[in-house]
């Protein structure tokens, strides 16, 4: 991939969620090719000092599925909105449909399969910024609204409304202000009425 200069993504910081060595170099190469600015390893997050307004968490495919789920939970449970509502992107190789859907159900903001053209990957990252994105929050899930992708037998029960409520959060991620909740809607189940 050829490195892109991108005035928007260049102001964002990529947080590499991977092991050191080849996986980290792969994420660094991806970040440079798509025009992302600074790259820091996930373990360095606490030592960054003042966080930039927009972070991208880039999770390497080499992490186990259990590890991916744990990372998503840690990020989505973080008290800082810049972390909790940062785009979490899975960087992967080509996937079969079943595996791809399992990652969608986990709650990734996007899944980028390599190799692909740097411009296309950059555009997909830009799609996470400067627009309202609908998130769903239940007692077991916080992430993008993926209900339109539900298929019979889907496995991510945490995304389903509980007997109590679910919340729709409209998130806007701007370079100047970072992620913000621009609209919140609570929905209670009819059985509780």
Regions from the PLM with identified roles:
Residues 35-44:
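Short hydrophobic/Thr-rich beta-strand motif most characteristic of the beta2 strand and flanking loop
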Residues 24, 44-84, 92:
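Conserved phosphotransfer microenvironments
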Residues 130-192:
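CheY-like receiver
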Residues 2-31, 57:
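Conserved acidic segment of CheY-like receiver
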Residues 116-125, 137:
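C-terminal output helix
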Residues 70, 94-110:
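Alpha4 helix (beta4-alpha4-beta5 surface) of REC/receiver domains from two-component response regulators
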Residues 20, 87-96, 116-118:
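Short beta-alpha junction loops
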